[in-house]
Amino acid sequence: MVLNLALVSIFAHYNTAQGGNSELKFETVYLTNAAPAARLDLVYRPGTVPRHPAILMIGSLKSNQPPDWSTNLVNEGYLLVAFTVDHPPDSDPAKRPQWLYFDERFAHSYVLGGYRAATDVERVAKYLASRGDVNSEKLGWLGSSSTGIPGLAVATRGPRLAAIVAFVSTGAYRQWLETWKPNGLWRGKRDMLWPETETLLRYDPILHVDKMFPTAVLMVNGAEDKVVDPKTARAFMDAARPYYRSDPERLRLVLYEGFGHNLPVDIIRMYAEHWFHLYMHPTDPPPLPAKDAENLTESVRRTQINAADHKKIIRAE
């Protein structure tokens, strides 16, 4: 099949293992209209909704089983899109990053990955728009660590996302790299980044938060994380906050005290379902901005969780 925007190869099969009213459909799509080629793995239930909201991820999907956190969302009509782009490695083998070796090469790989992600997603978004069964106004992102960090670059520089959920991630790239040495991670031969890394840091997400609203951003970090220091996540959110004054509930940072780079496994499903239901529901609109409480009495009233007034609970006059 040839589209105006891409040469697309599609391989699909169905699976009924997850239940629901229709079969799960797994597709592998290759976009080869431009180099490097991109591969998309898609999972969804056809016919559940007229147009699917799509959750984007860097990576791949198994051909017979969606991720555990996603099963309810897929049953409700969400489409999962995991993608990879075949960027060639550096022509100089000595400059290629080594996994978990925190030096200049490793630092450059993250900055370059964020820069590329914002462009790569443009191709993915154009393909999804061409399908006719995807709601292009409800594109979301889910990522954790190495897949969440580039997602925040997409939120500031890529096609408009409706929502993003990023675990143990940061959008303050330079500040994050500066924590590697004090946190005992740095193994570089010198304390300077490469000039090409410095050039790409012009696209550091924290420098472009003015373009992020109204994307609903939820970041969930470990308060004791030494790999992705939570103070850099807070710096990113603090930089974005002035641009969210009209709807501050769209910008949230959750810190788990006592946890580092590994958070409780169950929270991925919990936060993904909650955030995507709230800001990119298959059929419902997102919530309207909440009005500020006009006084202390109103503020206290909003903390009620049932019909009982707090005043009566403590038997105050």
Please annotate each region the language model reported.
Residues 102-145:
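Gly/Ser-rich "nucleophile elbow"/oxyanion-hole loop immediately N-terminal to the catalytic nucleophile
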Residues 51-60:
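Short beta-strand element of the alpha/beta-hydrolase
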Residues 234, 242-317:
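C-terminal catalytic histidine-bearing segment of alpha/beta-hydrolase fold enzymes
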Residues 142, 167-168, 256:
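Alpha/beta-hydrolase-fold catalytic nucleophile elbow
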Residues 176-178, 187-234, 238-240:
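The feature captures the conserved acid-bearing segment of alpha/beta-hydrolase catalytic domains
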Residues 148-195:
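Hydrolase active-site cap/lid region
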Residues 65-67, 71-119, 177-179:
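Cap/lid segment of the alpha/beta-hydrolase catalytic domain
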Residues 10-49:
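N-terminal cap/lid segment of alpha/beta-hydrolase-fold proteins
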